Amino acid sequence: MEHCILSLLPGGDDVEILIVDDGSKDRTAEIADEYERKYPGIVRAIHQENGGHGEAVNAGIRNATGLFFKVVDSDDWVDYEAYMKILKKLRELAGGDTVLDMFIANYVYEKEGVRHKKIMRYSSLPQDKIFTWNEAGRFHKGQYILMHSVIYRTQL
């Protein structure tokens, strides 16, 4: 979990890190509170009874104060260069006239001890451009967008 948090901190004041302690029996609550004390205004600890992954995500959405929301599980981390590139693009888009509902990026499965990375690419979607669902084309059976690849707008 700490690797995840440390990978998100370079976002600075532009990023609000919500750590949802979903009734964990490990040190999650303690670690969340520690980071909230160390990084006030950036990290917030949310404590709740266990409701499963979906309820933890919903708690994050309910408590988010920023314009965008992204799920990063505690055993995941973000690549620094990709993260900076995405934050730069989101800043540009937030300052413009275009209202962005979702930002979809490739997602890399990189398991420790496994030699090959698996990259989730969305070849049926237009690349490097803003598009509507009408332009997205059709998804085939078995195709989906992985939740971890999406950054969602929090406001209508």
Regions found by a protein language model. Give the residues of each.
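Nucleotide-sugar donor-binding/catalytic module of glycosyltransferases
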Residues: 1-156
